[in-house]
Amino acid sequence: MDSKWSRRTGSLLLLLVSNLLLCKSTASLPICPSGAVNCQVSLRDLFDRAVILSHHIHKLSSEMFNEFDKRYTQGRGFITKAINSCHTSSLSTPEDKEQAQQIHHEDLLNMVLRVLPSWNDPLYHLVTEVRGMQEAPDAILSKAIEIEEQNRRLLEGMEKIVGQVHPGIKENEIYSVWSGLPSLQMADEDARLFAFYNLLHCLRRDSHKIDNYLKLLKCRIIYDSNC
């Protein structure tokens, strides 16, 4: 009986590891191979990749926030100051699935294309400033680097999706400008740590929104809301 249990446990662990590796490898795949000419990817495949990417980004951002919170901010009461102080708060976006379901899919796509580029600068500077932190855990830095890369890939994929769903639509140039770099470089430790905490809190919030929006959009556009 012990040998059967061991074989069964080993098989389950192997299956779990295989699924995790598949998810990570899919998330790291480019939309088109490097140097490809006239690359065509089906709308279903584009949405599949976008949903995997957005879920992966949200998972990483949640883990990074939790690691930073545990290491740097215990007992500082930052959560009470972080509410509604995100640089993307100026963008009108639904707060939950119920609100998102009331919005036309074209408007929801435009919202995604406003939020994603709003994170290009913050993520770039987040990586730079985390590198300069004393004793910054490798886990936090590696996640910041990966999120920055995957956010660019997701934006690229979303532009291709919009190109197929609404051909000829003008490129969306409306996004929220981030001006928080000086806060990440402040000499006062509490103020600087709060700036990092708030940025990671907002990243977790926005990545969760994007993840929900894309799952809803995939359900509507690919499965005609039958999911």
UniProtKB/Swiss-Prot annotation:
<keyword id="KW-0964">Secreted</keyword>
<feature type="signal peptide">
    <location>
        <begin position="1"/>
        <end position="28"/>
    </location>
</feature>
<keyword id="KW-0597">Phosphoprotein</keyword>
<dbReference type="InterPro" id="IPR001400">
    <property type="entry name" value="Somatotropin/Prolactin"/>
</dbReference>
<dbReference type="GO" id="GO:0005179">
    <property type="term" value="F:hormone activity"/>
</dbReference>
<dbReference type="GO" id="GO:1903489">
    <property type="term" value="P:positive regulation of lactation"/>
</dbReference>
<dbReference type="GO" id="GO:0005148">
    <property type="term" value="F:prolactin receptor binding"/>
</dbReference>
<comment type="function">
    <text>Prolactin acts primarily on the mammary gland by promoting lactation.</text>
</comment>
<dbReference type="GO" id="GO:0005615">
    <property type="term" value="C:extracellular space"/>
</dbReference>
<dbReference type="GO" id="GO:0046427">
    <property type="term" value="P:positive regulation of receptor signaling pathway via JAK-STAT"/>
</dbReference>
<keyword id="KW-0421">Lactation</keyword>
<dbReference type="InterPro" id="IPR018116">
    <property type="entry name" value="Somatotropin_CS"/>
</dbReference>
<feature type="modified residue" description="Phosphoserine">
    <location>
        <position position="54"/>
    </location>
</feature>
<feature type="modified residue" description="Phosphoserine">
    <location>
        <position position="62"/>
    </location>
</feature>
<dbReference type="GO" id="GO:0007565">
    <property type="term" value="P:female pregnancy"/>
</dbReference>
<feature type="disulfide bond">
    <location>
        <begin position="219"/>
        <end position="227"/>
    </location>
</feature>
<dbReference type="Pfam" id="PF00103">
    <property type="entry name" value="Hormone_1"/>
</dbReference>
<dbReference type="GO" id="GO:0031667">
    <property type="term" value="P:response to nutrient levels"/>
</dbReference>
<feature type="disulfide bond">
    <location>
        <begin position="86"/>
        <end position="202"/>
    </location>
</feature>
<feature type="disulfide bond">
    <location>
        <begin position="32"/>
        <end position="39"/>
    </location>
</feature>
<feature type="modified residue" description="Phosphoserine">
    <location>
        <position position="118"/>
    </location>
</feature>
<keyword id="KW-0732">Signal</keyword>
<dbReference type="GO" id="GO:0008284">
    <property type="term" value="P:positive regulation of cell population proliferation"/>
</dbReference>
<keyword id="KW-0372">Hormone</keyword>
<comment type="similarity">
    <text>Belongs to the somatotropin/prolactin family.</text>
</comment>
<protein>
    <recommendedName>
        <fullName>Prolactin</fullName>
    </recommendedName>
</protein>
<keyword id="KW-1015">Disulfide bond</keyword>
<dbReference type="GO" id="GO:0007595">
    <property type="term" value="P:lactation"/>
</dbReference>
<comment type="subunit">
    <text>Interacts with PRLR.</text>
</comment>
<dbReference type="InterPro" id="IPR009079">
    <property type="entry name" value="4_helix_cytokine-like_core"/>
</dbReference>
